[in-house]
């Protein structure tokens, strides 16, 4: 069964669940920045690409605890870590133009991350073009677009981005999109940054044309947050938690519960899907407070991008410009 996830860190976990030893062709690094866990997954060659089912390149994951307890200061702290992570991948100077693309359907809250980020990006390309003498020389030209989805526009997202890119000729493209996760605890708590581009809709079985350097002719940095999880995954995780509690309190049935717990996770999820599918179909689940979470996460990501693209400015200056 194909496990629905867009996260490289979860692809790593899937491999480790089924194989012993290190992942061939993959370099891993884990460390913490305060309360934030950072995982770097570098797919080095075709061997690693096959093992991980991920394109050759770098994937960096920030796992953030306490999603509902953010204050402004902590949001800015996360944004600065995101910016610090982005900067080595961007490799652009003051004169290079960046195109920021907010992927997703703005009418569906869990899929509206990209458009919400674009609303808060510091857009400067028009100022550099029309009033160059009135703005700081260190400000980089940045433009943004929310191309919508095929069902709204009737045009493939990649076709819109390709046409815009051909016209304005950016030096780098940043794509922001909502992702899918296989773990409940990562939904709306994880930010993935990668330099291999993105396949919109892949995590929910609705794969569109890929957005990467090969298709667009420009380096593409992808930034994503898992906002949904498969209903079968929720059921699977719930069963595991129930079994854990039963094992703790059971005396004579402990071995039976341990046997159930030891069943292959993917096999359990496949069986759950078979049971659920006739009743609910392909169901994806998101938290009930997703509106508030989207506002917080989009602000974190947009601020991180603004800091990374405008290193000559202080955060106060960026916020002043946006307000």
UniProtKB/Swiss-Prot annotation:
One of its GO terms (biological process) is proteolysis. It holds the Pfam family Peptidase_A25. Residues 1-6 form a propeptide. Keywords: Hydrolase, Protease, Zymogen. It comes from the Bacteria. SUPFAM superfamilies: HybD-like. GO terms for molecular function: metalloendopeptidase activity. Transmembrane segments: none annotated. Disulfide bonds: none annotated. It catalyses: Endopeptidase action with P4 Glu or Asp, P1 preferably Glu > Asp, P1' hydrophobic and P2' Ala. Its EC number is 3.4.24.78. Autoproteolytically processed. The inactive tetrameric zymogen termed p46 autoprocesses to a smaller form termed p41, which is active only during spore germination. Initiates the rapid degradation of small, acid-soluble proteins during spore germination. Belongs to the peptidase A25 family. Homotetramer. This is Germination protease.
């Amino acid at each position: 069964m194909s496990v629905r996830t867009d996260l490289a860190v979860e692809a790593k976990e899937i491999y480790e669940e089924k194989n012993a030893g290190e992942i061939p062709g993959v370099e891993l690094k884990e460390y913490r920045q305060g309360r934030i866990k950072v995982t770097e997954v570098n797919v080095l060659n075709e061997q690693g690409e096959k093992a991980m089912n991920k394109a050759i390149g770098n994937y960096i994951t920030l796992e953030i605890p306490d999603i509902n307890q953010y204050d402004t200061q902590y949001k800015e702290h996360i944004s600065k870590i995101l910016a610090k992570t982005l900067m080595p991948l961007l490799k652009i100077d003051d004169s290079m133009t960046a195109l920021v693309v907010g992927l997703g359907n703005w009418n569906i809250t869990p899929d509206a991350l990209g458009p919400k980020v674009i609303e808060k990006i510091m857009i400067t390309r028009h100022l550099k073009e029309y009033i160059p003498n009135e703005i700081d020389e260190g400000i980089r030209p940045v433009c943004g677009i929310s191309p919508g989805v095929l069902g709204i526009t009737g045009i493939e997202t990649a076709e819109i981005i390709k046409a815009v890119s051909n016209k304005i000729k950016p030096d780098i493209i940043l794509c922001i999109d909502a992702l899918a996760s296989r773990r409940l605890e990562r939904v709306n708590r994880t930010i993935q940054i990668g330099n291999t581009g993105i396949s919109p809709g892949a995590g929910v079985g609705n794969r569109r044309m890929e957005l990467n350097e090969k298709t667009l002719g420009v380096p593409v940095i992808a930034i994503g947050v898992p906002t949904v999880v498969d209903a079968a995954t929720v059921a699977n995780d719930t069963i595991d938690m129930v079994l854990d509690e039963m094992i703790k309190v059971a005396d004579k049935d402990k071995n039976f519960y341990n046997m159930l717990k030891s069943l292959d996770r993917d096999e359990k999820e496949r069986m759950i899907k078979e049971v659920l599918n006739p009743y609910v179909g392909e169901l994806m689940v998101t938290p009930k407070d997703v509106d508030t979470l989207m506002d917080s996460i989009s602000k974190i990501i947009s601020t991180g991008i603004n800091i990374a693209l405008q290193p000559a400015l202080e955060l106060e200056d960026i916020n002043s410009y946006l307000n």
